[in-house]
Design a protein with these regions (language model features):
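Nucleotide 5′-phosphate-binding alpha/beta core
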Residues: 1-119, 125-142, 149-150, 205, ...
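ATP-dependent adenylate-forming carboxylate-activation enzymes
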Residues: 186-201, 376
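Conserved ATP-dependent adenylate/AMP-binding module captured primarily in the ANL superfamily
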Residues: 140-158, 194-207
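Adenylate-forming
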Residues: 217-236, 255-258
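Conserved AMP-binding/adenylate-forming
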Residues: 242, 247-249, 253-345
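AMP-binding/adenylate-forming catalytic core of the ANL superfamily
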Residues: 211, 318, 322-438, 457
Length: 481
C-alpha cells in the first residue's frame, strides 16, 4: 500500500512555507477527518516502516525484539503490533543510557546529527537525555504548528510562553510551534524570583492572544497580578493552553481559570520523551485530548497486560512515534491513567479522544483504608467548591497500623474574614464533599489564604509521611537483629 497523505513521509519532509486557507478549521483536512479504519491502514504501513528502521539502526530495539521473538517482518496487522511488540518503560531508557552514554543505544542517527539536547532534571536519579536531530526538530515544529492551528491560533497572533527554558521540552515545543505558525513569539520564561510580577506587567502591556504554561502557574500568576492591582481579564487573552500536569481537563480547574482570565482553556501534552508532545491535545471546539494518531500512535492499554482496552474504559496510554528518526519511541508506556473514546467530536476530527484528559500517574495513586485515591480527584472536588482558596496539600501519614489522609485546604479571604464559624462550616462542607467523591472520611484542616506555598511550575501537592514510619520500622527491625 502506497502512502499518499498530505506531507506524510518517513523521514518527515515538511514544507515550512505551507499554510492552509485561513478559513480552514484543518491544517491537513484529509489526515484529520478520514475514517478511522482508513487511517489505521495508513498507520499500519507507517509502523512497518518505523519498526524496520529502528531494528536496523538501533541495537536497543534489535536486542529487545530478538529476545521477544519479534521481527518487523512479522507485522501484518495492528493486532500484531499490540500483541508482538514489547513495551518500553522509562527504566529501560535509563539503563540504555547507562550502558551507552550519553544518549543510549536507541539513538538511530549519528551523534553529529543531534541538533538539540534536552532531558529530565534527574532530581530522583540519573537524568535521561533527549537527543533530537535537526530534521526531527523541524518536524516537531510543523506538528505543533498544525495542532496550535487546531486550537484556533493563526499567523500574526502573539503567543506568550511562560515556562522554564532549560532542559524542559514544554517551553521549547510551544516556542518552535509558534515560530512555525509565523506567530509573534513572546518567550517570557519562568522560574526566577520576582518574575511573575513582571510577567503580569508585560501581559498587561503586550495583550497577547495566547498563553502557554501550566495550570498551577496560571492560577499563581493571576493571584500575583491581582496583588499588583491588575485584573487578569485586562490581559485580553483569548486562549490559555497547558501541559505538564493534570488540570486543564478537570472541569473545576478549567472553569476557574477561564473565569479568572475570561479566555478559553485547552489541554495538551503527553510526555517529553514523545516530543512532539502536543500529540495529545484539544482543539478550539473539542475538549479533553484528541489523539493525533498520524503524528504519534496512541494505544490505551491495560497496565497488567499492555493490551488495548475497549473504548470507554480506563488504561495507561502507550505511545509510538511515527515521525521521529533520532530517538524513536516504540510502545513507550506513559504510566499515566486515562480513559478513551471514539465518539464523534465537535470539531469533526476523527481521532480517538481522552475526554477527561490525563487523570494523573498510576504511581501517584495511593490507597487509604482499601480505597484507591488519585490526587486529581481531590483537585477536581475542591475546585468545584466556591470558598476554596486555591491551594491545598495532601498529607498521608501512618497512625498505629492504619494509613490516614489529612487534607490541608486554604479557605478564600472572604470565608476567613467571617471568623471561626464560617471556617468550621467550610471544613464540614469539604469533609462531606470528599466522603462523597472518595468514599472515605478525611481529616480536614482549613488554613488561611495564601499560607501554602505557590509554584511557577508543576505543583507538588502530596506529602507522604509514611516513609518516616517505614524508616523507623526498618531501624527497629534491624536493632532486633
Amino acid at each position: 500500500m502506497s502512502i499518499a497523505l498530505e506531507s506524510w513521509s518517513f523521514p518527515p519532509a515538511y514544507d515550512d512555507n505551507y499554510f492552509p486557507d485561513a478559513a480552514s478549521r484543518y491544517w491537513f483536512p484529509k489526515r484529520e477527518t478520514m475514517s478511522p479504519g482508513e487511517r489505521e491502514r495508513f498507520i499500519l504501513e507507517r509502523l512497518k516502516t518505523v519498526c524496520a528502521y529502528a531494528y536496523e539502526k538501533s541495537t536497543f530495539y534489535k536486542r529487545k525484539w530478538d529476545e521477544a521473538g519479534f521481527h518487523p517482518s512479522h507485522l501484518k496487522s495492528l493486532e500484531d503490533f499490540e500483541s508482538k511488540v514489547p513495551v518500553v518503560y522509562k527504566k529501560d531508557l535509563r539503563a540504555a543510557q547507562e550502558r551507552t552514554p550519553p544518549f543510549g543505544d536507541y539513538l538511530c542517527v549519528p551523534e553529529d546529527d543531534v541538533f538539540h539536547i534536552h532531558g529530565t532534571s534527574g532530581t530522583t536519579g540519573r537524568p535521561t537525555a533527549f537527543a533530537i536531530g535537526r530534521n526531527d526538530w523541524r518536524a516537531i515544529a510543523n506538528a505543533h504548528a498544525r495542532i496550535m492551528w487546531g486550537m484556533g491560533l493563526r499567523p500574526g497572533d502573539t503567543i506568550c510562553v511562560a515556562a522554564i527554558f532549560s532542559l524542559y521540552m514544554g517551553s521549547w515545543g510551544a516556542l518552535i510551534g509558534a515560530e512555525r505558525l509565523r506567530a509573534k513569539c513572546f518567550p517570557f520564561g519562568a522560574g526566577v524570583p520576582g518574575m511573575s510580577a513582571r510577567c503580569a506587567q508585560w501581559l498587561n502591556m503586550i495583550k497577547p492572544t495566547a498563553f502557554y504554561g501550566t495550570p498551577t502557574y496560571a492560577l499563581h500568576l493571576a493571584q500575583v497580578a491581582q496583588d499588583e492591582g491588575l485584573n487578569p481579564r485586562d490581559f485580553r487573552l483569548k486562549l490559555l493552553f497547558f501541559s505538564g500536569e493534570p488540570g486543564a481537563s478537570i472541569p473545576g480547574v478549567r472553569d476557574r481559570i477561564e473565569d479568572i482570565y475570561g479566555a478559553q482553556v485547552i489541554d495538551c501534552g503527553s510526555m517529553a520523551e514523545m516530543t512532539p508532545w502536543m500529540n495529545v491535545a484539544g482543539s478550539r471546539e473539542t475538549s479533553g485530548l484528541l489523539c493525533w494518531q498520524d503524528v504519534v500512535y496512541t494505544e490505551v492499554c491495560d497496565p497488567a497486560t499492555m493490551r488495548r482496552v475497549p473504548y470507554g474504559q480506563r488504561g495507561t496510554p502507550v505511545y509510538t512515534h511515527l515521525e521521529r528518526t533520532s530517538q524513536p519511541m516504540i510502545r513507550l508506556v506513559s504510566g499515566d491513567l486515562s480513559l478513551w473514546t471514539d465518539e464523534p467530536t465537535p470539531c469533526g476530527r476523527t481521532y480517538p479522544r481522552l475526554p477527561q484528559g490525563i487523570f494523573g500517574r498510576i504511581d501517584d495513586m495511593f490507597t487509604i483504608r482499601g480505597e484507591n485515591v488519585y490526587p486529581s480527584e481531590i483537585d477536581a472536588a475542591l475546585n468545584e467548591m466556591p470558598h476554596y482558596g486555591g491551594e491545598h496539600r495532601i498529607v498521608i501519614s501512618r497512625e498505629a497500623t492504619m494509613d490516614e489522609l489529612l487534607l490541608r485546604v486554604e479557605a478564600d479571604a472572604a470565608t476567613f474574614a467571617k471568623g471561626a464559624d464560617a471556617v468550621a462550616q467550610f471544613r464540614a462542607e469539604v469533609e462531606r464533599k470528599l466522603l462523597k467523591v472518595l468514599g472515605l472520611r478525611t481529616l480536614v484542616e482549613i488554613v488561611s489564604p495564601n499560607s501554602i506555598q505557590r509554584t511557577d511550575f508543576k505543583a507538588r501537592r502530596v506529602i507522604d509521611d509514611r516513609a518516616v514510619f517505614r524508616d523507623m520500622h526498618a531501624q527497629v527491625e534491624n536493632a532486633r537483629g
